[in-house]
Amino acid sequence: MDSKFEHTPACGCLGRRNFLKMAGAATAVGIGGGSLLLAEEARADALTKEQRDKLTPEQIIKAMKKGNKRFRSGERKERNYLREQKASASGQYPAAALLTCIDSRAPAEVIMDLGIGDIFNCRVAGNVENPDILGSLEFACKLAGAKVMLVMGHTACGAIKGAIDNAELGNLTGLLAKIKPAVEATTYAGERSAKNYAFVNTVARKNVEMTVANIRKDSPVLAELESKGSIEIVGAMYNLETGAAEFFD
């Protein structure tokens, strides 16, 4: 990498103590760069293949949880997106593949403090799977080496509300039909209405759980990778009000 981007004790940007602290922190996690697992005081950079390949699925999930904690505390990593763009231009080695909703308030890279090159992100209303999505996830995990496959829903999801209300609109009708099984499978004692946010959020969670199950059922490629321990398929819910991402056990 171009030396003009590198920090050293002599550059004046950092005191010697802080520089050594940063270097020691990076060594402690077994990497010298990469935005996903660097210590909080270090600057972010693009993941390399060597760095990604050393990570376990559990470490990647832990890193995403820590990133969400930083997002909620307002202490996100210092980023130079131009630097990340240049560092990742010759190749990409994302650690995870995500299936998330298109909702503008739930951008995974932002809410988990991730950078360019950290993840693949498939976005579709209601975070539902289909053959094209499955093919994309298979590419991400089997061919490109991602080690975590995360399905993330969110609270107050408009697609969930539409499925509950049996909304119909062009091609959206068919998409919402994929969510209706989650509506039907949700056990709820209160008002089963799109106006009841507690019910909407309960359905959204069930939808994530069923999507995870469908991915395992409909993608032998991903199911085999998980059975071998090469990847972990998990679900999560993002809370629009609190900013917290809850990973399912």
Question: What are these model-predicted stretches?
Answer:
Residues 1-14:
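N-terminal secretory signal peptides
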